[in-house]
């Protein structure tokens, strides 16, 4: 049985001022069911990924975005209610990026994926 490649789309956003953190994402990614996909959310220069929580959302056509997870560190992360563990977060400090890893891709994972950052001075 031949598998149709899975297409994952991303939002690119790189506008704003220094008072607003700015993110960029690749426009699309293709992968096959059963494979893994790594989605990146790169912060613009001058904004350190280490100080931010990265939030990930999935949106399917005709539906509102659904919260997947947030990730700041291994000790500061949260999985959305009912979100399978095959969705996980991490960071790449050298690339100044947050990462959403989806393992064991399934056809229902075809969607738009959005990242958002949140910075809190509270510990």
From Swiss-Prot:
Region (Framework-2): 54-70
Main function: V region of the variable domain of immunoglobulin light chains that participates in the antigen recognition. Immunoglobulins, also known as antibodies, are membrane-bound or secreted glycoproteins produced by B lymphocytes. In the recognition phase of humoral immunity, the membrane-bound immunoglobulins serve as receptors which, upon binding of a specific antigen, trigger the clonal expansion and differentiation of B lymphocytes into immunoglobulins-secreting plasma cells.
Species annotation: Homo sapiens (Human)
Gene Ontology BP, a term: adaptive immune response
Record protein name field: Immunoglobulin lambda variable 5-45
All residue ranges annotated as the Ig-like domain in the record: 20-123
A Pfam family this chain is assigned to: V-set
Gene: IGLV5-45
Disulfide bonds: 41-115
UniProt xrefs under SMART domains: IG, IGv
Subunit architecture: Immunoglobulins are composed of two identical heavy chains and two identical light chains; disulfide-linked.
